[in-house]
């Protein structure tokens, strides 16, 4: 039969590339699970009353090349002006060796958060390097492995200051008047829910204020002034006030470390170390504190430990501080951070080293001196005598200056009274400075950059002597040996090779949705039209961004069944926080601010109670019944008991137990009956898209994990995006922004992120995914994700009981394998199975969440039947190994499971085990073998002997 032209065009080609099992494989799998078709399977699993009649209309599928061309045209609407706006964002030069071998490399960007350290040693080492950079530049004792952005880090600094303060009755937080406005915005948002009073005043007035527990200063003020705060910090410390200092990585290369001046906490953005502005993100924040406060630090901390063989190995340290363990008592609700961006900054420091960084920082400062000297010679006045890279220039004809700047396609900072701000950066050239002279002085100024350079080269007084760094930085060998491109390329490859990412095997982590991050989706993020825009540039320069964001928002509104969408939150946890704030402010608008009880099922993600606590709510836990579903009797009783204090419920759907609860609409009705709102956690949205939606179910607000459902890669622990969808009545209460008016948003609320659209530069990934899949493709992706999970559950249920199922014994898009009976019977634990899977070439499923002693498996739609079968066969082989332990063939103390994983070093060493080398390292044959570089980590040793900076190079050899 002759094919039609439409068939030959094959506009749905990407659907077949994204979805792993082909049509024939799907039929084989459907036969295994006992269903006639995908639609029949979904009909058996998803409650009929919440099934959509047709998928939301987000357009038809298109090819990768057509989608790229369409998005390229949209990107072309952006105007690439030269931006000197500053305010925490500057143009950068990302070394091509890092761009090509790391940012564009799926071995780096498709990895997961390093909960399994044995398969994560490469990026853990890069993160440890990031911590070392932070320690050297800040002069403090302990650093985290990144936070979401500088403004969020400021809010975390305030919260930490209160936690560690000895002034327990003090309730005021002082912010110096010259911090970045977006930082103040986010601090105020956080302070409101914590009940803190924020005082904003000139730094020299801080001692005039009483009942202050913490102070936030900015070393280089938002308009450029370099401050020597050493005397003030000393006085504040004498009064037991916790001092936080916002700093700039590049400035710190030349300036005195705030820790050396007595600061307790130092934070800032690492964006200047090679990360493009990207219209606001993603960027990693750095955060450091004194050793005495280490247990109160927010965010992930990488520590040095030992493995089972006594060799040095890295791991995430002190995890008992974090939300996945401490829940509402956690230091922070942070889950996703900015690992990929922290590692770019880390590798930027490795590549340039201390000498290269000093050269870059000195060049930036030299250009600032040249510009300042020329302007002063022509009679213009600088507002600050001491500066690093930013000049605040007083101008009489401000409108004329800005008009000349626009004509020259130059952005200056324009929001300063009677002045303009100019922030120089590593991309600044002599020609750029000449153009700035033309803009500020007109063409007839007669200034010459080379002549001015000779004047300032030997007599720069623009940084006070007391603020010049006098200690060495980055003396560790890792920062001093990889400066040729060959060495740098090989170093990055050596790190990548230690890790297990999606480019080698499936990552079956439950509740994480480790699906394909297609190459076509990733290509646009490095286009200069998207990567080079400043987040505070004039709106008419970002028309392409706004069109792309508006289209994506419209699609997501349709897919979620909501009325509006806020794109600001740049992680799922931050989306939760923003959604809960919307609920809080909605109640307050109705004079019901007393509603502060948040009901949370016992199975919930750890971020849920942590976010509720951060939003100023009291957490009340709702029980689950024996089938893992929300206990409606307990829910009704607790909702009724809360009465007029009920604010909301946070519920995940399908449930965290991997089941579509039949009573989800009744759950919503009960909460609404008592005046509460329904927050539906979007973590499991991959089992809803095209089949049902939160709005259709009856929820009021949800966040979406674009880094799960909509293909933004996990990056080894970030970036992410957590936009929130809301019903119309909550739309006025989503986050706003003090610097940029967000188009179409009538909100007057404060910001939760530094940038108005969060991590805007990764949104093209989700745009591309939806555009290429179309409505039917998105629905099919959800259906196949459910099929894959049921295929695994069906094939493994006789070997490992599936803990929770819905009607007809089905699961949703993930399943929980109960290891507890096996452990009771044989002594082999879920940890042993997880580590043994490494020998078989797999990342472990999620361990002991949401139920201790279990493994939660989520295969996603992207894994082929071949890969699913490989995983199933590995699990069945491990089950047989457990039988051999039970039967006494191997002892409980010496068998391939308790000794897993096995390394190459072990293979060539003297062998004393009661099983063969082949059983140890080649249990699934030799094809595509993954070799872990360390044995099982000793977590207890790591926390008892906390060490969170770079170790001698000999330890890695």
From Swiss-Prot:
The keyword Transferase does not apply. It is an enzyme of class 1 (oxidoreductase). Gene3D superfamilies: Aspartate Aminotransferase, domain 1, Type I PLP-dependent aspartate aminotransferase-like (Major domain). GO terms for cellular component: cytosol; glycine cleavage complex. It catalyses: N(6)-[(R)-lipoyl]-L-lysyl-[glycine-cleavage complex H protein] + glycine + H(+) = N(6)-[(R)-S(8)-aminomethyldihydrolipoyl]-L-lysyl-[glycine-cleavage complex H protein] + CO2. The glycine cleavage system is composed of four proteins: P, T, L and H. Belongs to the GcvP family. PANTHER family: GLYCINE DEHYDROGENASE (DECARBOXYLATING) (PTHR11773:SF13), GLYCINE DEHYDROGENASE, DECARBOXYLATING (PTHR11773). This is Glycine dehydrogenase (decarboxylating). The lineage of its organism: Bacteria, Pseudomonadati, Pseudomonadota, Gammaproteobacteria, Enterobacterales. The gene is gcvP.
């Amino acid at each position: 039969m002759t094919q039609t032209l439409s068939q030959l065009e094959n506009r749905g080609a990407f659907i077949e590339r994204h979805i792993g099992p082909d049509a024939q494989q799907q039929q084989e799998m459907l036969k295994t699970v006992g269903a006639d078709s995908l639609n029949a399977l979904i009909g058996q699993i998803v409650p009929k009353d919440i099934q959509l009649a047709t998928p939301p209309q987000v357009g038809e599928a298109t090819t990768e090349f057509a989608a790229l061309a369409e998005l390229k045209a949209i990107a072309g609407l952006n105007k690439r002006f030269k931006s000197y706006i500053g305010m925490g964002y500057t143009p950068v030069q990302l070394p091509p060796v890092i761009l090509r071998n790391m940012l564009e490399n799926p071995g780096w960007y498709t990895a997961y958060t390093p909960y399994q350290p044995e398969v994560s040693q490469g990026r853990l080492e890069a993160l440890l390097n990031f911590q070392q950079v932070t320690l050297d530049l800040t002069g403090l004792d302990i650093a985290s492995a990144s936070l979401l952005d500088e403004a969020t880090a400021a809010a975390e600094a305030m919260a930490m200051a209160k936690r560690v303060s000895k002034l327990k009755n003090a309730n005021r937080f002082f912010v110096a008047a010259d911090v970045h406005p977006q930082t103040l915005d986010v601090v105020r948002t956080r302070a409101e829910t914590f009940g803190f009073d924020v005082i904003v005043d000139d730094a020299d007035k801080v001692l005039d204020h009483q009942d202050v527990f913490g102070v936030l200063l900015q070393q280089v003020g938002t308009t450029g002034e370099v401050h020597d705060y050493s005397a003030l910090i000393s006085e504040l410390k004498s009064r037991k006030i916790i001092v936080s200092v916002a700093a700039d990585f590049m400035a710190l290369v030349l300036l005195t470390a705030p820790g050396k001046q007595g600061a307790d906490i130092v934070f800032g953005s690492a964006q200047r170390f090679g990360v493009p502005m990207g219209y606001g993100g993603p960027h990693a924040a750095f955060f450091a504190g004194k050793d005495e406060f280490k247990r109160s630090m927010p965010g992930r901390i990488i520590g040095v430990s030992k493995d089972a063989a006594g060799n040095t190995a890295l791991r995430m340290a002190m995890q008992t501080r974090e939300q996945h363990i401490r829940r509402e008592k956690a230091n922070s609700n942070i889950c996703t951070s900015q690992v990929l961006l922290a590692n770019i900054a880390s590798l930027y420091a490795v590549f340039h080293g201390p000498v290269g960084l000093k050269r870059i920082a000195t060049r930036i400062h030299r250009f600032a001196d040249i510009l300042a000297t020329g302007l002063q010679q022509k009679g213009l006045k600088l507002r600050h005598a001491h500066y690093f890279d930013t000049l605040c220039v007083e101008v009489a004809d401000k409108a004329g200056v800005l008009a000349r700047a626009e004509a020259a396609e130059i952005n200056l900072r324009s929001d300063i009274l009677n002045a303009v701000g100019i922030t120089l950066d590593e991309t600044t050239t002599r020609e750029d400075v000449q153009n700035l002279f033309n803009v500020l002085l007109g063409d007839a100024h007669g200034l010459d950059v080379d002549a001015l350079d000779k004047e300032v080269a030997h007599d720069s007084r623009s940084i006070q002597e007391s603020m010049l760094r006098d200690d060495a930085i980055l003396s560790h060998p890792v920062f001093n040996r990889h400066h040729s491109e060959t060495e740098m390329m090989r170093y990055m490859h050596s790190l990548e090779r230690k890790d297990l990412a999606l480019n080698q095997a499936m990552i079956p982590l439950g509740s994480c949705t480790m699906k394909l991050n297609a190459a076509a989706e990733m290509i646009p993020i490095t286009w200069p039209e998207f990567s080079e825009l400043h987040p505070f540039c004039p709106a008419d320069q970002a028309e392409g961004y706004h069109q792309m964001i508006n289209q994506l928002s419209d699609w997501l509104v349709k897919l979620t069944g909501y009325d509006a969408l806020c794109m600001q939150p740049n992680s799922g946890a931050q989306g939760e926080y923003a959604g809960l704030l919307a609920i809080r402010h909605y109640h307050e608008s109705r004079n019901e601010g007393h509603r502060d009880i948040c009901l949370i099922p016992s199975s919930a993600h750890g971020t849920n109670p942590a976010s509720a606590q951060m939003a100023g709510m009291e957490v009340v836990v709702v029980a689950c019944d024996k089938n893992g579903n929300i206990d409606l009797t307990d829910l009704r009783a607790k909702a009724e008991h809360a009465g007029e204090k009920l604010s909301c419920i946070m519920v995940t759907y399908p449930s965290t137990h991997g089941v579509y609860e039949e009573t989800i609409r009744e759950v919503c009705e009960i909460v609404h009956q008592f005046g509460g709102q329904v927050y539906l956690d979007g973590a499991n949205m991959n089992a809803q898209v095209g089949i049902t939606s939160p709005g259709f179910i009856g929820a009021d607000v949800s966040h979406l994990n674009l880094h799960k459902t909509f293909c933004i890669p996990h990056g080894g622990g970030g970036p992410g995006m957590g936009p929130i969808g809301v019903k119309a009545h909550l739309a006025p209460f989503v986050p706003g922004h003090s610097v940029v008016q967000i188009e179409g948003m009538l909100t007057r609320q404060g910001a939760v992120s530094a940038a108005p659209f969060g991590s805007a530069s990764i949104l093209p990934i989700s745009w591309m995914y939806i555009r290429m899949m179309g409505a039917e493709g998105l629905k099919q992706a959800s259906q196949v994700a459910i099929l894959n999970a049921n295929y695994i559950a069906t094939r493994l249920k006789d070997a490992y009981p599936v803990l929770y199922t819905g009607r007809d014994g089905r699961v949703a898009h993930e399943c929980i394998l109960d290891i507890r009976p096996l452990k009771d019977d044989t002594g082999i634990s879920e940890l042993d199975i997880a580590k043994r899977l490494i020998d078989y070439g797999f990342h472990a499923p999620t361990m002991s969440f949401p139920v201790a002693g279990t493994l939660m498996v989520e295969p996603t739609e992207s894994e082929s039947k071949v890969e699913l079968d490989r995983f199933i066969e590995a699990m069945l082989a491990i089950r047989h190994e457990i039988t051999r332990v039970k039967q006494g063939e191997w002892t409980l103390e010496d068998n391939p499971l308790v000794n897993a994983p096995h390394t190459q070093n072990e293979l060539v060493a003297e062998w004393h085990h009661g099983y063969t080398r082949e059983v140890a390292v080649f249990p699934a044959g030799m094809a595509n073998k993954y070799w872990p570089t360390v044995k099982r980590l000793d977590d207890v040793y790591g926390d008892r002997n906390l060490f969170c900076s770079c170790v001698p190079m000999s330890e890695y050899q």
